[in-house]
Regions:
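Structured, hydrophobic secondary-structure cores that serve as assembly/anchoring elements
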Residues: 2-314
Length: 314
């Protein structure tokens, strides 16, 4: 078509084009691979957005290779949006995440929220993984990375008109057993992240978000400090200098409730003559992480008027 007048209105049909709105799994992987190098790209929270199990597995691989980032993932839209039965939604969510491998570098949530899109002036369903990552970032801001981002203190999801899937208590318990952190709306309290598990299936300290992010924080900080020991002599002076750097840092983390106790071993017991001859430097750091409360038991006991509490307590 040749345009000869700048003011004339023309109706032109386009053919053989591609709107390019739906990125393939391979294209998404190419984009997220920009985060692969932990030395040049500093990122701690990776949001999966809307994607299938293969996409989430690809992101877990990126996070596990980096060892300093956590992936946040939601189920597929079709699992919860437009599904009228809540039990079917729960079954869909559990089934979807059962197909994703175990890892402490991923966090699963239970679905989608309905919110206003001010850029398009419409209401739409969006996956909750962006919100959960936002809660983790806000926890860093108002507390520390080793605090849980869940609960009524730090786990309120903003801007949610409603949830596509609002699980009941029984459904939340089943989701939690399946490594899925439920997001639920409570009357008068708001929409809340009601779990802090990672995607690790085996019982471990690292099956909690706060513990995984605690170790990421510790490992990044201490690894940065250890670089100053490179090309120094592996003698008692260097080892004492390293301990004097690490121990005050761990005491500060302990004072800020991240760990309950720690031990740093960096002496001749683990830096033997063989280690020194290999031009290596070894430090062993033992920590006891603080654990978040997941279950609360309240017992109310009625006593007679004349009974002393000293007699019945305990």
């Amino acid at each position: 078509t040749t345009f000869t007048a700048v003011t004339a209105v023309s109706n032109v049909s386009l053919t053989n084009g591609n709107d390019g709105t739906a990125a393939t799994v391979a294209q998404k992987l190419t984009a997220y691979q920009k985060f692969q190098d932990a030395e040049t790209v500093d990122v701690g929270l990776i949001m999966a957005g809307d994607g299938n199990a293969t996409h989430i597995d690809n992101l877990i691989t990126v996070a596990e290779n980096r060892k300093d980032a956590v992936v946040f993932a939601s189920p597929e839209r079709s699992d919860v949006v437009g599904v009228s039965d809540a039990n079917t939604q729960k079954t869909n969510v559990v089934g979807f995440f059962n197909g994703i491998r175990s890892s402490s570098y991923v966090v699963f949530d239970s679905g989608y929220k309905y919110q206003y899109d001010r850029y398009s002036d419409v209401y739409r369903y969006v996956p909750l993984n962006g919100d959960i990552a936002g809660l983790a970032a806000r926890t860093d801001l108002v507390a520390d990375s080793w605090f849980s981002p869940a609960g009524l203190n730090r786990g309120i999801v903003r801007g949610a008109v409603k949830l596509a899937f609002n699980p009941t208590k029984e459904q939340r318990d089943e989701l939690y057993r399946a490594r899925v952190n439920p997001v639920a709306t409570f009357p008068g309290q708001g929409t809340v992240l009601f779990g802090d598990k990672t995607g690790l299936s085996a019982p471990s300290a690292f099956d909690r978000i706060n513990v995984r992010r605690l170790f990421i924080t510790l490992e990044k900080a201490i690894s940065a400090a250890s670089k100053f020991q490179l090309f120094e002599f592996n003698d008692e002076f260097t080892r004492a200098n390293f301990r004097n750097i690490v121990e005050p840092f761990l005491r500060e983390v302990q004072g800020r409730r991240g760990i309950t106790d720690f031990l740093v071993v960096c002496d001749e017991t683990n830096n033997t003559g063989e280690v020194i001859d290999r031009n290596e430097f070894i430090a062993e750091i033992f920590v006891k992480p603080a654990r978040s409360i997941n279950f609360i038991t309240l017992q109310f006991i009625a006593t007679r008027t004349g009974v002393s509490f000293d007699e019945v307590a305990g």
